Amino acid sequence: MFQAVPGGLDVQLVFYRGLHECSASRWVSDGRALAGLMEKIDCRSGPTQIGRVLRHTRIENAKGKVSALVFVGDAMEEKPEDLYVAARDLGVQAFLFQEGDDPDVTQTFREIAQLTKGPHCRFDPGAAYQLRDLLRAVAEYATGGLKALSASRNPGAVKLLQQLK
């Protein structure tokens, strides 16, 4: 992501785990700092907390311009209607990247993306290169809009452009 747009991207990592934990990092502007934050996270079983992530994004956007929300997930255990309400009030395009092919998750993620005028893209489990390409494309879009995405040779940009135009 950071290599796609050197010096032009700030990222905040928001994650949830366990029964009630949903945390946000400080904003970082380089890949090493983000990797360091990600290395400290461990997985714990618990329900999804997508609604909390959406609400956090809305609050951060009210503090200052958030260009995009990138959500990567493989499950959804909340009431879709509650997520749709949160998505309508988001004020930020949501880029939803789904690992796997659960039809309920697909339907909900697709609707959230549509409500926020963002894309929903599936990628194959274990296909880190697909996710890498999608994240690079989001970085290009967040810093340069459709013009930058259209000029990109990144395979992820093609996937996003199909839904953003």
Place the predicted regions along the sequence by residue.
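Von Willebrand factor
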Residues: 1-26, 32-72, 76-79, 100-110
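A general structural motif
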Residues: 8, 64-66, 91
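Hydrophobic/aromatic beta-strand patches that form the interior of the parallel beta-sheet core
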Residues: 12-14, 70, 95-98, 119-121
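Acidic, Ser/Thr-rich peripheral helices and adjacent loops at domain boundaries
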Residues: 29-40, 113-125
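A cross-taxonomic marker for long C-terminal extensions/tails that follow the last structured domain
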Residues: 69, 73-77, 81-82, 144-153
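VWA/integrin I-like adhesion module and closely mimicked acidic/polar interface patches used
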Residues: 75-115, 123
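C-terminal "exit" segments of structured domains
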Residues: 120-165
